[in-house]
């Protein structure tokens, strides 16, 4: 488990390139036959990836010990979106088939969660967010057909994109975790511009569907003290509440967003006009 401490905005603006990457970038999300895990002190979110290839992968009791509990989800909820080949997730003996871009919400209290791929040649890639939970909601699979897509932006401003809200109150109940997937239309480069912050929630972005020769310049920092982190395929970035979170790519891309905090009101944002950015 990689533990990341909280950081004050006044400190963050003094960091150089490597300092920013050390604090906020999750560089390696998927490792064959293992789970990766980054624990942030910011709202106690955990992010990572699970890629079973030649064997099943489960999160062992050692994680429970690190969290001060008996097992991983004793006091937590889990959201998973599969960006790879078809796979399965077995929760306390109940097996769920999770295809490409299918998702699974696992409620607090699940003791055994086992991840597997159907075909080792095209392994599943389970990207997950995990947050503290106060009560148990039912484990539920969510497919792309159950998510009402919303298209925003314009080709003229290079920000036409489709937002798919997987784990939001209109789809299913969670304690605090919200997750979704945003896909840019071909030829579009910007996400979340004009940008915003949200004082009441933190957020994590996971960028994927990027060619090897492509990158995204992820914008962060306070609106009047902006910085950037260069992102490559299948990397994640932590965004504190005080930070904007936007990006521009060399080509179109897709990203998964996950939020935890005070509420689950998607539109609860503190908008920032482009003219006010520095």
From Swiss-Prot:
Keywords linked to the UniProt accession: Isomerase, Metal-binding, Zinc
EC code: 5.3.1.17
Cofactor needs: Zn(2+)
GO biological process: D-galacturonate catabolic process; D-glucuronate catabolic process; pectin catabolic process
Molecular function GO labels: 4-deoxy-L-threo-5-hexosulose-uronate ketol-isomerase activity; zinc ion binding
Positions of Zn(2+) binding: 196, 198, 203, 245
First-level EC class: isomerase
Disulphide connectivity of cysteines: none
InterPro entries found in the cross-reference section: KduI (IPR007045), KduI/IolB_isomerase (IPR021120), KduI_N (IPR027449), RmlC-like_jellyroll (IPR014710), RmlC_Cupin_sf (IPR011051)
Record's cofactor remark: Binds 1 zinc ion per subunit.
Gene3D superfamilies in the cross-refs: Jelly Rolls, pectin degrading enzyme 5-keto 4- deoxyuronate isomerase, domain 1
Biological or metabolic pathway of the protein: Glycan metabolism; pectin degradation; 2-dehydro-3-deoxy-D-gluconate from pectin: step 4/5
Entry-linked Pfam families: KduI
SUPFAM superfamilies: RmlC-like cupins
Catalytic activity, as annotated: 5-dehydro-4-deoxy-D-glucuronate = 3-deoxy-D-glycero-2,5-hexodiulosonate
Homology family: Belongs to the KduI family.
NCBIfam families xref list: PRK00924.1 (NF002091)
Self-association and partners: Homohexamer.
Purpose: Catalyzes the isomerization of 5-dehydro-4-deoxy-D-glucuronate to 3-deoxy-D-glycero-2,5-hexodiulosonate.
Annotated protein name in UniProt: 4-deoxy-L-threo-5-hexosulose-uronate ketol-isomerase
């Amino acid at each position: 488990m990689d533990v990341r401490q909280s950081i004050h905005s006044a400190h963050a603006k003094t960091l150089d390139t490597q300092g920013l990457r050390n604090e906020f970038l999750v560089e390696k999300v998927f490792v064959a036959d293992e789970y990766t895990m980054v624990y942030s002190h910011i709202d106690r979110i955990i992010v990572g990836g699970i890629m079973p290839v030649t064997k099943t992968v489960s999160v062992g009791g050692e994680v429970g010990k690190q969290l001060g509990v008996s097992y991983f989800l004793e006091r937590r909820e889990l959201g998973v979106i599969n960006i790879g080949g078809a796979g399965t997730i077995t929760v306390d003996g109940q097996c769920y088939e999770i295809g490409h871009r299918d998702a699974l919400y696992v409620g607090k209290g699940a003791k055994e969660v086992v991840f597997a791929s159907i075909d080792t040649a095209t392994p599943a890639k389970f990207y997950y967010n995990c947050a503290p939970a106060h009560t148990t909601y039912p484990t539920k699979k969510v497919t792309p057909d159950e998510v009402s897509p919303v298209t925003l932006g314009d080709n003229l401003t290079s920000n036409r994109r489709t937002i798919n809200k997987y784990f939001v109150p209109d789809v299913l109940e969670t304690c605090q975790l919200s997750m979704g997937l945003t896909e840019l239309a071909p030829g579009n480069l910007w996400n979340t511009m004009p940008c915003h912050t949200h004082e009441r929630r933190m957020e994590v972005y996971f960028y994927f569907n990027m060619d090897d020769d492509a990158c995204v310049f992820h914008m962060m920092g306070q609106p009047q003290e902006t910085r950037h982190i260069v992102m490559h395929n299948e990397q994640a970035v932590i965004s504190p509440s005080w930070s904007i979170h936007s990006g521009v790519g060399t080509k179109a891309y897709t990203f998964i967003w996950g939020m935890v905090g005070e509420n689950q009101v998607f539109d609860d944002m503190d908008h920032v006009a482009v003219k006010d950015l520095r």
